[in-house]
Amino acid sequence: MKYLLILLYFILSAGAVNANAKALAVRDVFTCQMEAFVQWDWEKTELTGYQKQQFKFSITDENTVKFEEASYFENLALNISYIGYKILALNSEDGNIVAKLKDDKFSIVAISYDASDFITAKCERL
């Protein structure tokens, strides 16, 4: 009986932690630290690594995420294609940029005729 009560306590407390986690919402602001930034250049057929930066972005309305200007993203605005409890999916109007945020993991891919960029970062909600 004692073990059953202990097990029940742990199950209920795990549920309480999840219930208190905050869902993604309009006006949320995230600060991120890049872990990798690489670019494939089709003409040179080479992969180049770039300096990792910090950047910020916010969910400005139900349809838009905007990045601050002091980074590689320079006021980039992306459309929200999906927003869930802890997941955010983004894309550009032309479909050349796709980004995902799940928990604290952020990835963004940009594709053009000349090059493809890939960035990963760890993010924290402010």
Regions found by a protein language model. Give the residues of each.
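Short, solvent-exposed aromatic-acidic interface loops
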Residues: 36-39, 68-75, 113-115
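Short, solvent-exposed coil/turn segments at beta-strand boundaries
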Residues: 58-64, 83-86, 100-107, 125-126
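Sec-dependent N-terminal signal peptides
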Residues: 4-15
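Sec/Tat signal peptide C-region and signal peptidase I cleavage site
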Residues: 15-22
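Edge beta-strand at a domain terminus
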Residues: 51, 113-126
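Short, exposed beta-strand-loop hairpins at the edges of beta-sheets
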Residues: 98-118
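Contiguous, well-ordered beta-strand patches that form the walls/edges
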Residues: 62-97
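Short, solvent-exposed loop/hinge segments that bridge or flank secondary-structure elements
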Residues: 26, 31-64
